[in-house]
Amino acid sequence: MTSITFISDTHNQASSLRLEPGDILCHTGDMTNFGTGPELKYFEDWFASQTQFKHKICIAGNHDKGLDYRNGKTPFKFTDSSITYLCDQAVELEGIKFYGTPWVNEYGPWAFGLHSYELYYRFGLIPDNTQVLLTHTPPKKILDYCPEQDIYIGSEELLDVVKLRPNLVCHAFGHCHEHSGRYLGAHDITFINSSNGNTQTIFL
């Protein structure tokens, strides 16, 4: 079996994590606080140093502004060959089909925010053969409750798409710091929120 370890929302604190060896390490966004070049380079160096994993995948989150190609500046590029960065892209590793997408509901001056109709388009690109889905936002009402504001911050558009993907086994995300953990949902999909250093591992 293949082990897949998930982390998210490390916000420049990734070096505080002590990760057990495994096959694939996935980071589901908000690697930084503001997405500056130095912050992203710091994360790249740390991520590349996790040589106890055979493969490493990451996607951006709303704090990772330097990766948003729409901001009028040349986006940061991960140059370390051991890192696979996904932005509306798929990759197959150890025979498992991954897809990564960073988009979130638009709010404030943050990165990768889209209106509802745009989210339906972006999430509609998720291939039917995807087995492990990496997003930054949770789907609506799945590990996305923020008690201070008494709201669910997940994406209804994402939920509508996820439940139509017939081969999906695991959906990992972050974004909501207050509700990390895992949940076995409909169609035996394992949903994982690994924000705030709450490392989660599955075996496929």
What kind of feature is each model-predicted range?
Residues 2-11, 26-28, 95-104, 131-136, ...:
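Active-site-proximal beta-strand elements of phosphoester/diester hydrolases
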Residues 11, 17-19, 110-129, 135, ...:
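Active-site-proximal loop/helix segments of hydrolase catalytic cores
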Residues 11, 32, 62-64, 102-104, ...:
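Catalytic metal-binding/acid-base residues of hydrolase active sites
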Residues 32, 107, 129-167:
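Active-site-proximal segments of metal-dependent phosphoesterases and phosphodiesterases across multiple
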Residues 90-94, 157-165, 170, 177-204:
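Binuclear metal-dependent phosphoesterase catalytic core
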